[in-house]
Structures are given as structure tokens and as C-alpha cells.
Amino acid sequence: MKNSRKALWAIPLVSLALLSACGDDNSSSSDTTATEETTATEDTTATEDTTAAETPAGDTGKGEIPEGATEVVIEGDVTTWEGKTVGIANLAPVPGAERWSKPLQACIEENGGTVDFQDVGGDPTKLPALLEGWAASKVDAVFNIGIDMSGQESLIAAFTEAKTPVVIWGAGNPEGAVALDANQEEDGRIIGRYLVEKIGSGQVILVNANNPALQSREKGLTEVLKAAGIELVVVGDALGFSAESAQKSVEAALQANPDAKAVVGGFGSLGVGAAAAVTAAGSDAIVVSMNGDPEEYDAIRAGGPFVATVADGHEFGGEAACQIAANMIAGNPAPGEAGKQILATSVLVTADNLPAAGESEGTPRKFYQLP
């Protein structure tokens, strides 16, 4: 397969905070006002190994754990929250974050706990002050959705010393924290296998942004399409997290690649923008995405080019975080093997299993750790 990256990256330093909000970022600049632009091209060659395109023994597109993984049982008496106070750090007021943080908040408050909910608006530099404040006020637990925990080791250690659980989702895997997440790379494989089944051959456009979770999805997608001999053209702006940005990138990509059979959005908003571009161009390409946000379900329901997404199950992750921390406050150890992320299963969603309007994908999620 030929994998061509045709992306124009424009990265103002003052906006790099958004990139590091969900993981590490290696980009840097000494000028806070200038914009650095680079163009990157990557070529790969197809191999004879096609195992990546095969569905694993556990069908990960139907909420099963991957072959070789170890299931982790989540349990905890949530009535433990009575009279307790916690801090929740939320990346931004977007579905991908609030689908985790809001069920978590509800679980704690409905069981008598008090929540200090803080949204950093995409700015991870606000996290240290929040953690310091929560340490000083001696909260009973700390939660974080999507804000990179790099550099916070000393604060995490202080919480650990105080027996204060730190439970996170999509925020790295720092020592001392219980790290939950979706298997982002596997999400890419799931949507990749769907495309192989639907189009068989040809060219696919991926519109993506520079974020660790999105790059992991790209890696899984690339693996599957490469094995099937399908060409992947990658476009997008580093900070292009909006539907409008994705639409602009895909419109240009379709002009250069009018025979593309499919367009993939790195997450929900990018998929919605891609669908608008495909419609405007009069293209026959199908559009797919990953996340399982309400806007994706609405796009599938509309009956246009948007036909599938991978639902991560953030809601179940929030409920699991509530149970895990409650169990730890009660004096029990964290579940699973220490130091390894606890991953939630995902579900491929099409028109055939689309949730009702206003509802999330309801398949019970399993949690697991990789070898």
C-alpha cells in the first residue's frame, strides 16, 4: 500500500496546549507569535503479511476484548462516596470529554459525594494549580479526563502517599495513577476492517489532527489498509480539531484525489466535516469516523455519506472510574496489574445498530489489559 501524508501543519506555540491535552507532543518553537509550517510526506510499501486485516478471535468491533488480553473486573461500593469530596479535571466542554466526566460526576453526587468540577478549556497548563489546590484541601479522590499528566509525578506521588486515588482517562499512564482509556489503536483497526469489507481496494483519505489518541488511531488504520493494499492519503491541520477545518482539508484532498472511495475522520467532528466536504463535492465516497459522539450518530441517521463510527464507551469508563476510586477509598487495591492501562472495549456503529436519538451506544463494555 502507498501511504501518502499530504498535510500542511501550522502550529502556533500559544496553541500547543491543546495538543498536549491528551498526550505528549514533541513540537516546539521559540517564537510565540510566528507560525511554523512544514509539509511531510511518508511512503510505505505493501507486504505479503495480511494478518492485520483479519478479524481477531474476540470480535473487537462488537465489544469483545482482543485475543491475548486479560479481562479486568471492575467493582466497588459507590455508597462509599457519602460525605466525600473529589476533584474532576475536564479537558474541554466537548462530547469526547463530557461523555466520561458527566456520568462520573453523577455517580458520585447521586451517592452523597461533593464534586469540584473544573474544565480547563483545552489548556493543560491549568492542571498543576488544580492538583495543588486539591492536595491542599485534601480531597478524597482526583479524576482527570484527557489532560496530559506528564510532569505531574510529584503531585501524583503526594496523592498516593495520602491514599487519595487518582483515576484518569486518555491522559497517559503515569506511575501512581489508575489509567483508563479506549484502545485507540484498535479503534483504527476496527474502522479499517470495515473499510476493507466495504470498498475492497482503491484509495482512502484520512483527515486527522496532531493529538496522541488520533495518531494511535491512524496507526491502527494504516496497519489494516496497508495489509489490504489500499492507499491511504493523510491530510489535515495540526490544530484542525473542528468540523470546519476538516471540511476545508477534505475539499482540497478530493480535488487532488477525486477517485477516493472513502474518507475517515480521526474523531467525530472531523468525520462530520468530511461528510460535508464529500456532499459538496458530489463525491460517491463513504465517510466513517471514530468516537461515538452524538453528532456522528446524527450524521448516520441523516442518510448521507456518513455511514459508520466506532463508539469508545466513554460513559462506561466514567462509571468504572466511580467504582474503582470508591473501592480504593474503602482500602482495596486498584484492579488489574499495576502500571498497565485498563482499556475499554469499543463497538462499530452503523445504521443497523444505531442508538435512538439522544441515546449513547449501550453495549456493556468490558475492561482489559494487554500483555
Residue ranges and their predicted role:
Residues 56-83, 224, 228, 316-371:
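Hinge/cleft segment of the Venus flytrap/periplasmic-binding protein
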Residues 149-186, 190, 293-306:
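Flexible loop/hinge segments that line or gate small-molecule binding clefts
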Residues 85-86, 90-97, 104-106, 190-237, ...:
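An alpha-beta-alpha
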Residues 141-161, 221, 239-299:
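Hydrophobic alpha-helical
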Residues 69-73, 179-204, 216, 244-247, ...:
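Hydrophobic alpha-helical segments within soluble ligand-binding/sensing domains
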Residues 22-32:
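Bacterial lipoprotein signal-peptidase II cleavage site
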Residues 1-20:
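Sec-dependent bacterial lipoprotein signal peptides
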Residues 57-108, 115-128, 145-149, 208-216, ...:
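Extracytoplasmic "Venus flytrap"
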